[in-house]
Amino acid sequence: VIDIRNWLKECGSPEGEVEIIAKIESRAGVNNIDEILEASDGIMVARGDLGVEIPFEEVPNIQKTIIHKCRIQGKRSITATEMLESMIKNPRPTRAEISDVANAVYDGSSAIMLSGETAAGEHPVEAVKAMAKIAEQAEKNTQYINYIKPEDYHIKNLSEALSHSACTLAQDIGAKLIVACTRSGYTAKLVSRFRPMIDIIGMTTDERAYRKLALSWGVIPVMSEEFSSVDVLFHFGKCAAIATGLVKKGDKIVLTGGKPNGKSGNANLISVETI
């Protein structure tokens, strides 16, 4: 991972522009997960390969451990391979596959991924629809947020403290949405780390950041025009919240972000607005 980062730097790629997802598929990867996670932007748990490289009965615990570590570090986690394997040939998933997908959601995965089902399967569209339905239903479980809410995180800087405060404030006042106004996507990812019980809007002016945010847990990416002041920033944030259809007149929202001309990644503002 470090070699890839050095190569990207040599090629002139700005730091953070290209994110690296490390695929864990061997005992060596599992044994060195902390170091790999520190160097990466996220982890893919490749259960199919893991089940070949290590005893298959260990895979579920390894999956849960890796996802938990990702949540604590605020890194993305992707659970992948053989999730709806039977749908390569069949139009419906098995009951075991349905439970597998749901449990990956309960574990707190940032994303769940299909591979052979859509790459070479006979029912690719049905597989995507089935996985989406299972994930949406799993998230409706009233205990879902309790399963995945990290308790042992460590606040390292002002941006993390502000993002945590935004989540706590939103819960205390009964806000319907958190709007993270972000240029690079960093602020939205920090808010996502704390797994708030409400949706997060990641509002950005950067198309690359917009695409990346689709992989962050609970984040709805929204493109915005450039903003020249804090007032304009928060006005656009309210407009973005209304455009999603998730709020109505009288609802409260929490907005967080940084000064328009400030350094990327240095969120230092928080506000409560009423629609």
What kind of region is each of these model predictions?
Residues 1-275:
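Non-catalytic helical/linker scaffolds that mediate oligomerization, partner binding
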